[in-house]
Amino acid sequence: MTAERTAGALALAITASVAALLSACNILQPAMYLAVGPTKVPARYVLENRPTVVFVDDRNNAIPINSSRARRAIADDVTKQLMSRRLVTQTISPRDAMALARNQDREGKLMSMQAIGETVGAEQLIYIEMLRYRGSPDNVTSQPTAECRLKVIDIVNKTRLFPPPGAERDWQAVVVQTAPVSPELYRSTAGRRQIEQLLVAAIAGQVTQLFYKHIPDELGSRLTPQ
């Protein structure tokens, strides 16, 4: 065999080997994904296991209709998820905290989160402030969207736990957008109530995800922390 033929045969053999290797990689990658699973996003903050209360505020009337109902639902849902995922072992009814604040507001007295936490017996308070809560991001697209910001307060030591002191921002921002919904839902009271429930679930779920390692959502609502 001539040197040229030998070199050609060697090149063909190398090419075949590389092709086989690449083919094997294409097979192995999905198999490895199934075996190991998708990469999880780490928690932004791990809550301390202390008596915790969730407070949802809407000082700027971001929720246009039934603000109190939506705020209670979000706070209740976050509280249930904290307990079900064992992120904390003791929570205080958010409705008690929000009712206390509402009663003080009626008397013209604005209570601080520190005072509310102390009064209801909490040692840790998750404060969520609603910034946007709409059935559509542009009044055209039928895709409910909401935005809020939050912080975790140490009631005992009177300091902010998350974001930590010295962080670039004092708040953790969360933007939530559900999957598109049928335009028909906007045309009835029952449909609009369903949209509200979708947003409540999306907000509560994405807020809670900040506190534990999780798989990023591929369908449904999406989280954009800033």
Region spans (language model):
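Extracytoplasmic/secreted cell-surface and envelope-processing proteins
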Residues: 63-64, 135-139
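A structural "domain/chain start" motif
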Residues: 25-96, 208-226
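Short secondary-structure boundary motifs at beta->alpha junctions and helix caps
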Residues: 154-213, 217-220
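A mature extracytoplasmic/lumenal domain signature
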Residues: 58, 95, 129-132, 148-154
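Stable alpha-helical elements in mature extracytoplasmic
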Residues: 70, 74, 78, 109-113, ...
